[in-house]
Amino acid sequence: MSKIRVYQLAKKLGISNKELIDKLKELSIEVNSHMSTVDNENADVLIELFTEQNKEETKPNVDEKPPNQDTLTDNVNESAESIQNVDKKHFKKEINSTKNVTPNGNNKKDKKKKNKKDKRKNYIANNDVSAESKGEQVIQLKNKLTVKELSETLNKSASEIITKLIGLGIMATINQELDYDTASIIAAEFGIEVEPMTDIDAEEDVFDIIIEPDKPEDLKHRSPVVTVMGHVDHGKTSLLDAIRKTKVTNSEAGGITQHIGASEIKVNDKKIVFLDTPGHEAFTSMRARGAKVTDVAILVVAADDGVMPQTIEAISHAKAAEVPIIVAINKMDKPSANPDRVKQELADQGLLIEEWGGDVISVPVSARSGENIDALLEMVLLVSEMSELKANPNRKAIGTVIEAQLDVGKGPVATVLVQNGTLFIGDSVVIGNTYGRIRAMMNDSGKRVKVAGPSTAVEITGLSEVPEAGDQLFAVDDDKAAKAIVEKRINKIKEEQLKAGQKISLDALFSQMEQGQLKDLNLIIKADTQGSVEAVKQSLVKLSNDEVVINPIHGGVGGITESDVMLATASNAIIIGFNVRPTSNAASAAKKENVDIRTYRIIYKAIEDIEAAMKGMLDPEFVEEELGKAEVRATFKVPGAGTIGGCYVIEGKILRNAKIRLVRDNIVIHEGSIDSLKRFKDDAKEVATGYECGIGISQFNDLKEGDIIEAYHMKEIER
């Protein structure tokens, strides 16, 4: 040991903490309390000094009679018994269990004190209780424990513990939780040495068994998992559509895939699993996650565009994951297609095509006409056969979450790719910081299945919470084991949280940066799906610079709630909402606590706003002013007018010329304008709180009972 605490040294020397502190101050050694440390050099000097003093003190007195032999024997026996009974939980000072009786029966204070010192010295000398040997007697304490647990661990009564806590200015009850620092101070007050518990976590015990290598004879061939990568608008989803013969592209806003999907197809009685990762740079983290679970990467490059920035990034991800790449040169039906230029640009990035003497397979295809799609699939099967993909179906399942979201009817739902083992309905699982029992499984066709083997993508329900996209799934023995693992993980996270400070907004960001007041910009990100949360998070983190670090402290699925606002208040954070809205309580709390909430439908706008704020150029001319809210309580189909919502105005007022957004379960479904606003059969300019009305939304008919229509307008503010 390089240093020793004051109370440990005092115990070793057989004196009180106060005496030792006074002595240290006399020797100009700075200490503040019994928990302060003294280096070995100074400790040796003190030991030598006190040893000399004790020698003078304990010179034999000729007039004093020797102690009674029986008393000495009793003392020695008691000391020996005390030493033998020392353990981690019930370590007591030997000196407390030994009676100090003088030969003539006198109980004089000075002799009692002297006997204590002698016994301490004898104990140290005879039993070599050094700092090192004490290691066996150190009690291990958990990071968090109650007063009752501490009293049991230290073998002291709860009232003694509470008395010590009151002495420290802490008013506690028997069930109050204490942290390790407080508990260690209490232990030191009783002269008991403690250290943090370093036991093996339950999850390590469980996962060591789960991740045990499979025996070669148990391994069987499994289907390949393919990720389609490439630059935005190069035709990844269209290529998958051609393969699956579906039309996903038409349903995606702006033709850009925003959520990961997984699908299975059969080619010559062999199965291939496709992961459709989004192509835009904003979803880099989702694409990186796809590369981790994939066996083959299809790199889509448009024959007329060539290699683009996100193409290079996709190559990097595939190479980092050591995934074999097949290049699909798409849009070959276009007159401007130039495959040779594409091959040259790929060679510049380290991908040398086979026909040019390299080892990368390339297939010219057309997603629109279906040209060479079969050849591409044959190449996928060929590459997967060369990779010898195997898994053990006869073990507990291991998999990865591809996508996760909160479904109104089903609760937390996760799309999982089973990578090893077999997942059954009724299995207890741990996924990241959540757990559950599999209630139902659906394949990519929407059919219920009872079993999911290796290389199978299924949607599962029965989880306690929405997991993180990219979390690993482990099947465990039972719910009890799953819950224990998750509780340990959550406790670790809780121990690392909570900050406070001055409120921050985007408008004041640059001025605080200039004054040096702001070093971290804390963000809370809420979105409609977990994949979107990750995408927004990764995009904003990239904006960090030398002056300010973008720090997403929390991300979640669903609307912005009051608890999010409270976290923002405590953490000095800005709330970013992507495709979600704040609840009424959250909006009120944000106004009261002066928390900045920014909501976006397009990810680029969020990036632009924060970038502009960091450069000091954010000068908003318009702000959104909420006018009112109406709840849809019935729907009516009117010929020529579409679907009309029978609404009740629950807040503010609805204006005929206002802009509106339709919110369902705190997620924005549509933004637009009011087509018609009526009270009974008459047109109305506005409808106030507490009145019913009929609302028709321009070019939108998917109204449902329970939807909230929010009316607002953009108000110009003074610069």
From Swiss-Prot:
Start and end residues of each stretch annotated as Disordered: 54-75, 97-122
Molecular function in Gene Ontology: GTP binding; GTPase activity; translation initiation factor activity
G2 as annotated region, ranges: 255-259
One GO CC annotation: cytosol
Region (G3): 276-279
Binding site for GTP: 230-237, 276-280, 330-333
Biased composition (Basic residues): 109-122
Region (G1): 230-237
Superkingdom per UniProt: Bacteria
Alphabetized UniProt keyword annotations: Cytoplasm, GTP-binding, Initiation factor, Nucleotide-binding, Protein biosynthesis
Record's compositionally biased regions (Basic and acidic residues): 54-67
UniProt main location, coarse: cytoplasm
Residue segments, region G5: 366-368
Compartments it resides in: Cytoplasm
Signal peptide bounds: none
Positions of the tr-type G domain: 221-390
G4: annotated span: 330-333
NCBIfam families, per database record: IF-2, small_GTP
HAMAP family from the UniProt entry: IF_2_B
Function of the molecule: One of the essential components for the initiation of protein synthesis. Protects formylmethionyl-tRNA from spontaneous hydrolysis and promotes its binding to the 30S ribosomal subunits. Also involved in the hydrolysis of GTP during the formation of the 70S ribosomal complex.
Family recorded in the similarity comment: Belongs to the TRAFAC class translation factor GTPase superfamily. Classic translation factor GTPase family. IF-2 subfamily.
Protein name (record): Translation initiation factor IF-2
Organism of provenance: Alkaliphilus oremlandii (strain OhILAs)
Lineage of the organism: Bacteria, Bacillati, Bacillota, Clostridia, Peptostreptococcales
Recorded name of the encoding gene: infB
